[in-house]
Regions:
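Hydrophobic transmembrane alpha-helices and immediately adjacent juxtamembrane helices
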Residues: 1-246
Length: 246
């Protein structure tokens, strides 16, 4: 294991342990958040299942929003956090690439998000009439592939907003708005003239019956574009001086 790979491993481990410590210290806040998300998930699924959408599809949409939103938020907020504590320069000089650092942080966040989503699913399974056995039984390989590709695209957006955080200070508010845009674009039908805009939102592609190979290509294109935009933002911020300012 090389020095830089070891450094990334310790970043993942420390981030996971820190999240565990936060979970213990702020357990009440986490419980309230899980209850709120459980209620939102139930209301969305109950409302749209009456419009003919399958339970498996609705669960997949909510999963994309829940995990994808956390991925994007974590990647953008990590930059602001490290700048605030004055550790961004150290990471920049000692980790192979900031892109790798953000990827590791996002993987840790995704793991926790999946665990929390499992808790939400358990709550809905125990206390509502929603049958998760039916949902999982009806979920097709295509559904799983769409979820994976949507989360890959979310990584691209995470890099994009992280790059903006290197240059601008007030990016977190836009990230929050974009998170709800993901939710809106997946569940709400929009006029055809806005279809191009919703197509830019991860996970909304399936409503247009996009072939799976095109979905895969689009998600990888989003990831590449986000990666490149972050690299450009990094160069601009180091030359312009915003990289070194909190």
């Amino acid at each position: 294991m090389t020095r830089r790979i070891r450094a990334l491993y310790y970043i993942f481990k420390s981030d996971f342990v820190r999240e565990l410590a936060d979970l213990k210290h702020y357990s009440f806040n986490y419980v309230v958040g899980i209850i709120n998300q459980s209620i939102l998930c139930y209301l969305l699924i109950d409302a749209f299942s009456k419009k003919g959408e399958t339970f498996a599809t609705l669960i997949g949409k909510f999963f994309i929003w829940y995990v994808g939103r956390d991925l994007i938020t974590e990647m953008a907020s990590s930059i602001n956090e490290e700048k605030h504590f004055g550790t961004l320069e150290y990471i920049y000089l000692n980790v192979h690439k900031l892109e790798s650092y953000l990827l590791v942080k996002s993987l840790s966040t995704a793991l926790w998000s999946v665990l929390f989503f499992a808790v939400i699913s358990g709550i809905l399974f125990m206390y509502t009439s929603l049958d998760y056995h039916v949902a999982l039984g009806n979920m097709q390989p295509r559904d799983i592939a769409v979820i994976v590709f949507a989360l890959v695209a979310c990584l691209g957006y995470g890099y994009f907003f992280a790059g903006l955080s290197l240059i601008f200070r007030k990016v977190s508010s836009f990230v929050s708005i974009f998170g709800y845009l993901i939710l809106f674009a997946q569940f709400i039908s929009v006029d055809s003239k806005y279809s191009v805009l919703t197509f830019l939102v991860p996970g909304a592609w399936d409503k247009y019956q996009v072939p799976l190979n095109v979905t895969a290509g689009v998600s990888l294109l989003f990831l590449l574009a986000g990666w490149l935009s972050f690299s450009v933002s990094l160069k601009l911020s180091t030359k312009g001086g915003t990289f070194w300012r909190a």
